[in-house]
């Protein structure tokens, strides 16, 4: 299946000059969403994954059905102040400022094999932060899966030491 045909491109959103790749049109098509989920599950099974991790919000949309299909758990990575129990945090730089992501301190057990999922790889900052959180808890990142990779933003450089797959790529 050619998933690219199900991606909507929204010009000049969220700001002028940006061509936003919208995956909601994959999600609202049961066949396309199921296909994407199944492909990531196949990838994960080859890596003997124990738990799936995904950053909010679209990492949840990808990771939860994958975890459910595999009969394993899902651990969310969220913005600061959104998780109710004790958390670990990771602060990282954005173009104009910083951002903080958190994860429950007991979400990952040392030695667990982790798949990180998200909708899209752009600059790599969010996924790099998720990796740091998982590894701080003693997890082993055995794979990272995306629906889309924007190759022209070169986010892969931040995570080049990890096994990464994407179902769709855009060169420009």
Curated annotation (Swiss-Prot):
One of its GO terms (biological process) is purine ribonucleoside salvage. It comes from the Bacteria. Transmembrane segments: none annotated. InterPro entries: Ade_phspho_trans, PRibTrfase_dom, PRTase-like, UPRTase/APRTase. Its EC number is 2.4.2.7. Gene3D superfamilies: 3.40.50.2020. It is found in: Cytoplasm. Keywords: Cytoplasm, Glycosyltransferase, Purine salvage, Transferase. GO terms for cellular component: cytoplasm. The keyword Transferase applies. It catalyses: AMP + diphosphate = 5-phospho-alpha-D-ribose 1-diphosphate + adenine. Pathway: Purine metabolism; AMP biosynthesis via salvage pathway; AMP from adenine: step 1/1. One of its GO terms (molecular function) is adenine binding. The keyword Endoplasmic reticulum does not apply. Catalyzes a salvage reaction resulting in the formation of AMP, that is energically less costly than de novo synthesis. HAMAP family: Aden_phosphoribosyltr. Homodimer. Belongs to the purine/pyrimidine phosphoribosyltransferase family. This is Adenine phosphoribosyltransferase. It comes from Staphylococcus aureus (strain NCTC 8325 / PS 47). The gene is apt.
